[in-house]
Amino acid sequence: MKGEPKVIERLNEALFLELGAVNQYWLHYRLLNDWGYTRLAKKEREESIEEMHHADKLIDRIIFLEGFPNLQTVSPLRIGQNVKEVLEADLKGEYDARASYKESREICDKLGDYVSKQLFDELLADEEGHIDFLETQLDLLAKIGEERYGQLNAAPADEAE
């Protein structure tokens, strides 16, 4: 089914963001794990995999609309050098995705592509869940300090990899 070029463009823009998020969350997972934040690292790993599933849905939709998914470029990574910077970097990426998906859903609605609009609605709901989690973690970090936050997010030695 031939899709609207503007919709395919927006789907590829979302793919650009999701592919960057996959890489950013995965690198943050590895860094956090190395720093001893094993529980938070596990969450970052899960987020990376979820973003990969988002990318897969976008690729599927682009192909269905007879477009070509652009996997050649990904959004620039924001890599934190400590736990606070990791959370802030991830939050900035989620804010960017939310803004893009809101705009994309409106374009899809105007062009009558309600299935792509629904996909953007699903992505938007997931990104807002990520935003809530990250904002909560940053609030918690500010309230209890990095040392206590580290204790909450470190697994006991016998559970660590």
Curated annotation (Swiss-Prot):
Chain ranges of the Ferritin-like diiron domain: 1-145
Keywords on record: Heme, Ion transport, Iron, Iron storage, Iron transport, Metal-binding, Oxidoreductase, Transport
Amino-acid positions noted as binding Fe cation 1 in the UniProt annotation, renumbered to this chain: 18, 51, 54, 127
InterPro entries noted in UniProt: Bacterioferritin (IPR002024), Ferritin-like (IPR012347), Ferritin-like_diiron (IPR009040), Ferritin-like_SF (IPR009078), Ferritin_DPS_dom (IPR008331)
A GO BP annotation: iron ion transport
Cofactor descriptive note: Binds 1 heme b (iron(II)-protoporphyrin IX) group per dimer.
One CC-aspect GO term: cytosol
CDD domains from the UniProt entry: Bacterioferritin (cd00907)
Entry GO MF terms: ferric iron binding; ferroxidase activity; heme binding
This enzyme's EC code(s): 1.16.3.1
Binding site for heme b: 52
Binding site for Fe cation 2: 51, 94, 127, 130
Enzyme class label: oxidoreductase
Necessary cofactors: heme b
Cystine connections: none
Catalysis: reaction(s): 4 Fe(2+) + O2 + 4 H(+) = 4 Fe(3+) + 2 H2O; Fe(2+)(in) = Fe(2+)(out)
Annotated NCBIfam families: bfr
Stated family: Belongs to the bacterioferritin family.
Subunit structure: Homooligomer of 24 subunits, arranged as 12 dimers, that are packed together to form an approximately spherical molecule with a central cavity, in which large amounts of iron can be deposited.
Function: Iron-storage protein, whose ferroxidase center binds Fe(2+), oxidizes it using dioxygen to Fe(3+), and participates in the subsequent Fe(3+) oxide mineral core formation within the central cavity of the BFR protein shell.
Protein name, per record: Bacterioferritin
